[in-house]
Amino acid sequence: MMIQDRLFPATGMPDRNWWHVLWPDPDGVIKALRIETGMTVVDLGCGYGYFTAAIARQVGPGRVIGFDLDPKMLEQAQTACEGMMNCNWLPGDAMELSCLLGARADYVLMANTFHGVPDKTALAREVAMALKPDGCFAVVNWHPLPREKTTVLDQPRGPSTGLRMPSEQTRAAVEPAGFKLEALVDLPPYHYGAIFRKTASHEKGEESAA
């Protein structure tokens, strides 16, 4: 069992072969999620770096931080992003992101992991503290389809049906942490991206607490 699976159930990285078939155009996914040139982006739970490399290409002079609990996954991600000078790597628990990150980010992406987080709103609060004012948090989730309907290479893939989150459920978990849903993006064939913007009221609350 991967380290990630022990804390966030059903979130371990899948076999590369079918993952690449499911996501043939990672660069297109990153563009659809409105990640822009020059941003500082955290790939939270980056695994072996499949989306990290695409983010690095998109942000150009910006920076991407691959963040994962499993050092072995980070080693694989570093290999996947070899030669990309705008990549940094940070091992740690996602629930300690803001403390470990130091400087705040423009954007945090969490792809295919949020469904397994035990306290989703607490994690979203941690992400909010790691973001600059007006920063974005994007959650990529499987559509709430029966698992037997989400096949890749003729096999059912993804988390169990009961773990899949409708976009309304994702919104209900994230918005109380100081975010507002900005956009829902369909990511065929089986995913959606929910892009949340950090609210000004949350930023003021952080300043008051400080």
Placement of each model-derived feature along the sequence:
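Short glycine-centered segments of the SAM/dcSAM-binding site in methyltransferase folds
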Residues: 40, 63, 134-136
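C-terminal lobe and adjacent flexible extensions of AdoMet/dcAdoMet transferase-like proteins
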Residues: 194-210
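A short glycine-rich, Lys/Arg-flanked "PGG" loop and its adjoining helix->strand segment in the class I
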Residues: 121-136
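Class I SAM-dependent methyltransferase SAM/SAH-binding core
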Residues: 42, 48-97
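C-terminal alpha-helical "lid/dimerization" subdomain adjacent to the S-adenosyl-L-methionine
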Residues: 5-6, 10-20, 136-195
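Conserved alpha-helix/loop element of class I SAM-dependent methyltransferases that forms part
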Residues: 20-39
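A short SAM/SAH-binding and catalytic strip from SAM-dependent methyltransferases
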Residues: 106-120
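A short acidic, Gly/Pro-enriched loop at the edge of an enzyme's catalytic core
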Residues: 99-107
